Design a protein with these regions (language model features):
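Juxta-kinase regulatory segment immediately upstream of eukaryotic protein kinase catalytic domains
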Residues: 1-25
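Protein kinase glycine-rich loop
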Residues: 28-33
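Active-site acidic catalytic loop and adjacent metal/ATP-binding pocket
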Residues: 34-53, 85, 198-255
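ATP-binding pocket architecture of kinase catalytic cores
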Residues: 47-143
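A cross-family kinase active-site recognition segment
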Residues: 116-186, 215-217, 327
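ATP/Mg2+ or Mg2+-diphosphate-binding catalytic cores
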Residues: 146, 150, 161-170, 177, ...
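Active-site activation/catalytic loop segments of kinase-like enzymes and analogous catalytic loops
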Residues: 253-288, 303-321
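All-alpha amphipathic helical-bundle segments outside canonical DNA-binding/catalytic cores
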Residues: 289-301
Length: 354
């Protein structure tokens, strides 16, 4: 579709900020299934590559600028997997469209994501993350510091809330019942039965008893899902890009490893346990983990399963939040439900989820 054919004045205004009056070809890649942001590829014929424009609420502008500073610093340090942030014609990297949205433009990264990596892909991904972490630790805007990881504190607090408001007390909101709400309610029943059978309340009590140890914190990606790591199509064991840094914040690097390893499928076709061990070994060949970081990777993975489910149940069934792509939401929830018994068992000391 040509830009002139797009029925969105705000988006056309944003494109003009980067491209002037050129009538370029645009391709809607997606609307982020979880944040609602519009994501559009702009095929502009630039030798540097196509652009990807993404929208945010205008109030997020300071936050976006912080993320852009991090991304620029990482690329300057040699992390070429990080997409290049492109400045507008006025020189800024964030543009407001007059319709309540702020926009960014980054270079399009061509690649393929996988949630069933080969061992070589797992090693390549983790090595790229290790290099990214080393570079992020040198960013002057967010120097490393020692403190209790926010990820740990949040989980301890959420365990307390879940014990006081368990899943069987979750009710659907009044008013219209959505198909997503019906589907989520069915999964809540399933997860509640698993929780009862596996002793989830005991696992939550162990989380509340967690001794939150201070460790090194730095800028990390935090939302490092398998879908955000792209491999080249002609050389599938080489990382082409790591995309979407907009959840980045100061936390323990263990959060990125736990999220990435935890988002890989654990099916019989791929020896994922071996892949996880090899991934950690590849990471440590570049950036050795401290003893506390080692301990936190599986702990954060197991607890993310439990609290991720809790978030989805309450977002949909209590707060009545809507999401554009229900199928993707349910796919993620189904995976979490499938992992719930293993996560509870690991917290009970029976086996590890990674």
């Amino acid at each position: 579709m040509l830009l002139s054919e797009v029925n969105d004045g705000g988006f056309r205004s944003a494109c003009t900020a980067w491209l002037g009056d050129r009538d370029v070809v645009v391709e809607r890649l997606a609307t982020d299934a979880f944040s609602g942001s519009a994501i559009v590829r702009v095929c502009n014929g630039d030798p540097g590559g196509d652009l990807v424009l993404k929208s945010f609420p205008a109030k997020a502008r300071p936050r976006i600028a912080w993320v852009h500073g991090l991304m620029a610093s990482l690329r300057a340090a040699g992390c070429r997997e990080v997409p290049a942030v492109v400045s507008s014609r006025s020189g800024g990297t964030v543009v407001e469209d007059g319709c309540g949205r702020a926009w960014e433009a980054v270079r399009f990264v061509s690649g393929v994501a996988t949630d069933e990596p080969s061992v070589r892909q797992a090693r390549a991904a983790s090595a790229a993350v290790a290099r990214l972490h080393l570079a992020a630790a040198a960013w002057p805007a967010a120097p490393p510091r020692v403190a209790v990881p926010p990820a740990v504190t949040r989980r301890i607090e959420q365990a307390g809330r879940m014990l006081s408001e368990p899943w069987h007390s979750v009710a659907t909101p009044g008013g219209e019942v959505t198909s997503l709400g019906d589907a989520m309610a069915a999964r809540l029943v399933q997860a509640t039965a698993i929780a009862r059978e596996t002793g989830l309340s005991g696992a939550l009590q162990r989380v509340m008893a967690e001794r939150a140890m201070p460790t090194m914190l730095q800028a990390v990606v935090r939302d490092l899902w398998s879908s955000h790591v792209l491999f080249t199509t002609d050389e599938p064991t080489r990382v082409a890009g790591i995309v979407d840094f907009h959840a980045a914040a100061g936390d323990t690097p263990a959060t990125d490893l736990a999220r990435l390893l935890g988002s890989w499928c654990r099916g019989p076709a791929i020896p994922v346990d071996d892949a996880c061990r090899e991934a950690l070994a590849a990471y440590e060949s570049i950036r050795p983990l401290s003893a506390e970081e080692h301990r936190l990777v599986p702990w954060l993975d197991a607890t993310a399963t439990i609290f991720g489910l809790d978030n989805w149940f309450r977002w949909v069934l209590v707060k009545g939040r809507r999401f554009e792509c229900s199928a993707r939401v349910l796919e993620r929830v189904d995976r979490l439900v499938g992992r719930l018994p293993g996560a509870v068992a690991w917290l009970g000391g029976l086996q590890g989820p990674v």
